Amino acid sequence: MSNGIQDIRKLSTYYPNLETLIHYVNYDTLLEEHKRQLSSKAVGVDGVTKKEYDSNIEENLTNLVKRMKTFSYRPRPVRRTYIPKANGKLRPLGIPSYEDKLVQGVMARILNEVYEPRFLDCSYGFRENRNAHQAITEVNQLIMYRKVNYVLDCDIKGFFDNVDHKWLMKFLEHDISDKNFLRYIVRFLKSGCMENGQLEESKKGTPQGGLISPVLANVYLHYVLDSWFTKHVLPTLKGEAYLVRFADDF
């Protein structure tokens, strides 16, 4: 990771609230994200492929940065499609435009650097050097070696589609005071969805198919579940209790 984004983690360790983040979304970081995206074959909702965007990359990114600085850049509504699930049902999937993927990709990297020092050890999903196998191992170790008699397995139904925007922004504002950076997060949250030619407003939930959605989900659950359990539940207990979370499964 280059272009200064790697410095955010150190800043986040020392400062409880970060004031300037939007400047990390610049030509260099967008170009770096574009190179990451080139290996994928997916086409954005606007029909633009990576190779098409790459053919005039300097002008395209210069124009994108200019629009972001003047706040004339607005994310497009994602196109909703459906993919089959293992149980035979269909899972909705959102396809964003290519430029939106670039901006979201950079903003997601920034958010991950902000929050990685702040997330608790009980969280395993969508985090650097953490995975489901580690979560399973941790659960196994707790059952085998700690004073655990009961296991409660929970899955938050429809979590990603029902995240409360107002509370999510409050959580972000607790750690980030860069209004311009937060403004673009709100725009992504409110960008809407196109299905069968009809625009559906986004009143709740994280962007479908968005690169920024996993870290936003982790921020939300960090406050409403992880921190709540650690700071408010554990001190009231006489025995032992542990939380192991992978995304919305815990």
Which residues are covered by each model-predicted region?
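Non-catalytic, polymerase-adjacent accessory regions of viral genome-replication enzymes
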Residues: M1-T62
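Short alpha-helical scaffolding segments that buttress acidic/His motifs in well-ordered protein cores
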Residues: E33-Q37, V106, Y184-L189
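Residues immediately flanking
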Residues: V45, Y98, R109, C154-I156
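Conserved polymerase palm-domain catalytic core
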Residues: R67-M68, S72-Y82, A86, R118-C122, ...
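Conserved phosphate-binding loops in nucleotide/dinucleotide-binding enzymes
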Residues: P92-S97
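Duplex nucleic acid-engaging cores and interfaces of nucleic-acid transaction enzymes
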Residues: E99, V103-V106, A132, Y150
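Solvent-exposed aromatic/hydrophobic patches embedded in short alpha-helical segments
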Residues: L102-M107, L111, L216, Y220
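Electropositive, glycine- and tryptophan-enriched low-complexity nucleic-acid-binding patches
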Residues: G105, R109-Y124
